[in-house]
C-alpha cells in the first residue's frame, strides 16, 4: 500500500487565504528561475489554488498547455474557475496522476512546489512525475528546508518554537528537511543533468511586502499549534510567549528574515 500524505496546515478558509498571500509573495521569484520554450506543455503536481499554475501557463504563451493536479476538493474547485483551453485543473493524487493514455510521457516540464515535504513517500511521487515527462523534458522541484530559517534579531523563545514546528512535521511522517535532499531524489530516480539552486524567500522591515511576509510566517506556525502542544513539543505558555515575541519582532525597524527555498532540476533521458 502506498503511504498517504498528511497536510500539516489544514484546509480551512484561513489557510486558503494564507496560500494566496504566499503565492503573491513567491510566484514571480520562482518564475524567474524557470526557462520555458514557447508553447510548452507543463504539468504542475500539487497545484493548490492554481495561482502558480496560471503563471506558468501565461509564461508558456500561445499554443501552450498547462495542467494542474490537486487532491483537495476546495482548492481544485477554486482553481477550476480559472480554466481556459490552455489551462486545465484535475483532481488527483501525486502517487497516481489522473492522466490520459496519450498524456503519459508528453509533458515538456513537470513542476512541483511545497508538495514533497508533505508526502510520506516522495520518491514514489517523483517516479510518477517522471512517467508524465517526455524524454528530454525537465522536472523542477521546489521545497522547504525548515532548518534554514533565520530571524534577526532572534525573538526570545523563537528557536524553541521553530524547533517544535519542525518536529511537528516529523511526528506525522512528513519531512521538514526535504529541500536539501531534492537533488539526491532526482539522481536516485535516474535523472540526468541534475542541478540545485535557491530562491530567496526572506524579507525585512521597511519592505512593502514585509507585513504580508510576517503574517504568512506567524500563520503557518499557528496551523501546527495543536499538533505541537498535543505531542508536548512545546507547552501552551511557551507557545503563547514565543508567538507574542514574534509579533513584537515584526514591529522592529531592523527586523530581518532570511529563508531560502530549495530547487532541484533534472532531465529525463
Tell where the protein language model's regions lie, with residue ranges:
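Conserved Class I S-adenosyl-L-methionine
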Residues: 195-269
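Conserved alpha-helix/loop element of class I SAM-dependent methyltransferases that forms part
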Residues: 21-38, 55
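Conserved catalytic/acceptor-binding region of the Class I
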Residues: 140-208
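A short SAM/SAH-binding and catalytic strip from SAM-dependent methyltransferases
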Residues: 108-121
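Class I SAM-dependent methyltransferase Rossmann-like catalytic core
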Residues: 3-24
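A short glycine-rich, Lys/Arg-flanked "PGG" loop and its adjoining helix->strand segment in the class I
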Residues: 123-138
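A short acidic, Gly/Pro-enriched loop at the edge of an enzyme's catalytic core
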Residues: 98-109
Amino acid at each position: 500500500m502506498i503511504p498517504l500524505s498528511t497536510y500539516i496546515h489544514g484546509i480551512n478558509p484561513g489557510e486558503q487565504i494564507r496560500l494566496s498571500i504566499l503565492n503573491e509573495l513567491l510566484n514571480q521569484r520562482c518564475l524567474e528561475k524557470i526557462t520555458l520554450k514557447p508553447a510548452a506543455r507543463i504539468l504542475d503536481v500539487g497545484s493548490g489554488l492554481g495561482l502558480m499554475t496560471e503563471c506558468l501557463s501565461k509564461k508558456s504563451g500561445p499554443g501552450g498547455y498547462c495542467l494542474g493536479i490537486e487532491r483537495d476538493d476546495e482548492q481544485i474547485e477554486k482553481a477550476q474557475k480559472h480554466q481556459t483551453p490552455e489551462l486545465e485543473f484535475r483532481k488527483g493524487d501525486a502517487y497516481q496522476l489522473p492522466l490520459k493514455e496519450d498524456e503519459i510521457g508528453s509533458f515538456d516540464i513537470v513542476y512541483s512546489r511545497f508538495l514533497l515535504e508533505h508526502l510520506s513517500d516522495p520518491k514514489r511521487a517523483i517516479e510518477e512525475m517522471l512517467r508524465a515527462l517526455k524524454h528530454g523534458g525537465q522536472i523542477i522541484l521546489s521545497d522547504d528546508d525548515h532548518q534554514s530559517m533565520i530571524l534577526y534579531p532572534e525573538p526570545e523563545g523563537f528557536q524553541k518554537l521553530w524547533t517544535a514546528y519542525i518536529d511537528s512535521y516529523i511526528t506525522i511522517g512528513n519531512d521538514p528537511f526535504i529541500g536539501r535532499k531534492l537533488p539526491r531524489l532526482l539522481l536516485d530516480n535516474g535523472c540526468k543533468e541534475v542541478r540545485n539552486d535557491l530562491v530567496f524567500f526572506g524579507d525585512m522591515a521597511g519592505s512593502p511586502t514585509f507585513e504580508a511576509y510576517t503574517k504568512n510566517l506567524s500563520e503557518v506556525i499557528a496551523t501546527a499549534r495543536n499538533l505541537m502542544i498535543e505531542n508536548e513539543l512545546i507547552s501552551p505558555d511557551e507557545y503563547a510567549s514565543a508567538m507574542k515575541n514574534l509579533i513584537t519582532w515584526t514591529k522592529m525597524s531592523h527586523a530581518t528574515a532570511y529563508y531560502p527555498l530549495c530547487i532541484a532540476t533534472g532531465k529525463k533521458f
